[in-house]
Structure formats: structure tokens, C-alpha cells
Amino acid sequence: MSTRTVSSSSYRRMFGGPGTASRPSSSRSYVTTSTRTYSLGSALRPSTSRSLYTSSPGGVYATRSSAVRLRSSVPGVRLLQDAVDFSLADAINTEFKNTRTNEKVELQELNDRFANYIDKVRFLEQQNKILLAELEQLKGQGKSRLGDLYEEEMRELRRQVDQLTNDKARVEVERDNLAEDIMRLREKLQEETLQREEAESTLQSFRQDVDNASLARLDLERKVESLQEEIAFLKKLHDEEIQELQAQIQEQHVQIDMDVSKPDLTAALRDVRQQYESVAAKNLQEAEEWYKSKFADLSEAANRNNDALRQAKQESNEYRRQVQSLTCEVDALKGTNESLERQMREMEENFAVEAANYQDTIGRLQDEIQNMKEEMARHLREYQDLLNVKMALDIEIATYRKLLEGEESRISLPLPNFSSLNLRETNLESLPLVDTHSKRTLLIKTVETRDGQVINETSQHHDDLE
């Protein structure tokens, strides 16, 4: 009789040892083993096949066949009809005892491993609870502190940005209005400058007219003076002539008195004198009238020129006052524009600095949020790994429980009583030789997944003969 014991542990396939654990992977393998056993012998026990379905953290599903079979080393047993071969029974009992001893040792080891697994599962559950508490605490802190602070600061920043945008728009509108006012004032200044230039040119022409009138007046005054001098000279000459004539008349009168016989010259002289006096009076009157007319014309022209000059001076003074007032207004508007531009530049600089600070704050908060997310993701991955390990350990525990229950049920079966067997004599030579083979078909199915989707699936068949 020969005995073959096949035992395997899915823990070694999953962890590689009592205290190690493998990382999760994205592939799964399904291994199915079917075992058929054909044996000859009256005392041969049927083989038992157990399938273990285990799940490791890497997603590997394996099926193993553990069978304990007892086979006879000879094709048949030669027994007498009324006698029992007790040596064969002793050999079977000895072999069965050895098998039971080995199974007890293996069960003891399995119990020790099972106790270690339970301790490890309890430790991992405690760690899992601690990590869950830390995760809930971090979630609560993130929701209560960081989220509120971030939202409040973002609202404050948005409010300040909106206020600065409104201030900037208002300042730009004021700047545009001031620019329009400045353009309008510049156009008005240009118009006033043109009018002033026209007034200055008119004033210059008036000044030339005044100068010409002054020259004409001086010329006329000189002419009047010369005429007055001429009139005085003519009057003096006339007086002298009159005196001479009177003297001549007196002399002639004396001569007439002396010489009565001479012709009467008094009447002739009187007539001549009257003629000269009438001519002189006429000339004097004409000269006075001409002088008066000329003087009146010159006075009127001078008055007109004086009025025009006075009006031009008044207009020039008015234009000068307007130019000064407009210059003052332009200077004031320039100062206001410069101050507004300076304020606008300062506001833009302050806005840029505040915006940069807000961007830095937002970036820092986003970095903190990203770090918190990464830390939460890391905790979630660790939690998932622990869950996978826990599931694997639960499946391993269930598997060992099934093994233990199967072994307990097998141990509780009664042993066969060889003394009560009704055996008959059999000729070994008359029995045909039957070649006993055990055919095992191994199906390996590999499925690769990524993000919950199947990306590759392969199947392999292996046939083994025993």
C-alpha cells in the first residue's frame, strides 16, 4: 500500500509567509482543477476532493484539490474465503494512524496560524478603526474649518475685487468726462486764441489807423498853425497896408486941402479900402470856415479813432481777462487730471499688489486643499488595502473553517471492520490488469481590469495524467 498526501495553503499563495502581505494588482486568475481517481482494491478508500476558493488582495482566485487517497500497491488482494489477512489490516491501520498523526500535526499548525490570523485581523481592525476615526476627524476639520475659512475668504476677495472693479470703472468714467471737458476747453481755448489773434490784428490795424490819424492831426495842426501864422501875417500886412493907405490918404487929404483943384481921391481910396476890407473879410471868413471844417473833420475822425481805440482796448482787456481765466481753469484742470491720474495709478498699483496677494493666498489655499485631498486619497487607499487584506483574511478564515469542518466530519466517520468482511478467494492471475490513471484538467483564466473595465482576458488548459 502506498499513501500520497497533498495539502496546500492559500495563505502562502497570497502572502508568501505567515507575516507578509502582497500588494493589490489589477489582474485576476481563475484556476479550476478537476480530479478523477480510478483505483482497484477491495480495501481502497474512495478519494475525496475539496475545492478551495480564495481571494487574495491581488485578486487571484485559485482552486486546489487536496485529496488523501489510500491505494494498494498490488492490483488485487488474495484472500481465502473463510480467513482474513490481518497483516494487511495491520498495515492499513498503521498507515492510517500515521496519516492521522500527520493530519493532527498539520491541524495544530493550522490552528496556530489561525490564531495568528485572528490576532492580526483584530490588530488590523483596530488600525482600521483608528484610520477611520482620523479620516472622519480630517473630514470634519476640512468641512468645519478649512472649507468655511476658504469660502469666507473667497467671498471677501470677490467682494473686494467687485468693489475695486466698480471704483476703477467709476474713475475711468470720471477720467473720460474730464478728458472730454479738457478737449472741449482746449477747443474753446483755441477759438479764444484765434479770436484774440484776430483782435490783436484788428487792434494793430486800429493802431496804425490811430497813428495815421495822429500824423494827419499833427499835419493838420501844423497846417492850422501855418494858416494862423499866415492869417496873422496877412492881417498884419493888411493893417500895415491900411496904415500906409491911411497915411497916404491923410497926405492926400492934406494935399487936397491944400490943393482944392486936385481931383477927389478920398472917395476913391475909400472905395479901394472898402474893396480890400471886403476881400480881406471874405478871405478871413473863408479861411476860418475852412479851418473850422477841417478841425471839425479832424476832431470827428480823432473822436472816432479814440472810440475805436477805446473799444479795442476794452475788447483786448476783456479777451486778456478771458484768456487769464481760461488759463487758470486749464491749469486747475491739468492739476486735477494729474492728481486723478496719480490716484488712478496708485489704485492700479494697490489693486495689482492686492490681486497678487489674493492670488498667492488662493494658490496657498489650493495647495493646502490639494495636500488634504492627497492625504485623504492616501488614507482611502490604505483603508482600501486594509479592507482587501481583511476580506482576504475573512475568506482564508472561512476556508480554514470549511477545512476544519470537513476534517472533523471525516474524523467522525466509523472505521471499517475487517473481521466482518465477507471475502472470497480470488485468483489474481485470473483478474485482468487494469491500468489506473488519474486525469487532472487545469483551467487557468486570467482577466486584466483597469478602472472597473476588462481590458484583457486569456484562458489556458492543461491536462495532467497521474
UniProtKB/Swiss-Prot annotation:
Protein name listed in UniProt: Vimentin
Residue list for modification Phosphothreonine: T20, T426, T436, T446, T458
Region (Tail): 408-466
Region (Coil 1B): 154-245
Cellular component, GO annotation: axon; cytoplasm; intermediate filament; nuclear matrix; plasma membrane
This protein's encoding gene: VIM
Alphabetical keyword list: Acetylation, Cell membrane, Coiled coil, Cytoplasm, Cytoskeleton, Glycoprotein, Intermediate filament, Isopeptide bond, Membrane, Nucleus, Phosphoprotein, S-nitrosylation, Ubl conjugation
SUPFAM superfamilies per the UniProt record, alphabetical: Intermediate filament protein, coiled coil region
Motif ([IL]-x-C-x-x-[DE] motif): 326-329
Glycosylation, residue list: S7, T33, S34
Subcellular localization, as worded in the UniProt entry: Cytoplasm; Cytoplasm, Cytoskeleton; Nucleus matrix; Cell membrane
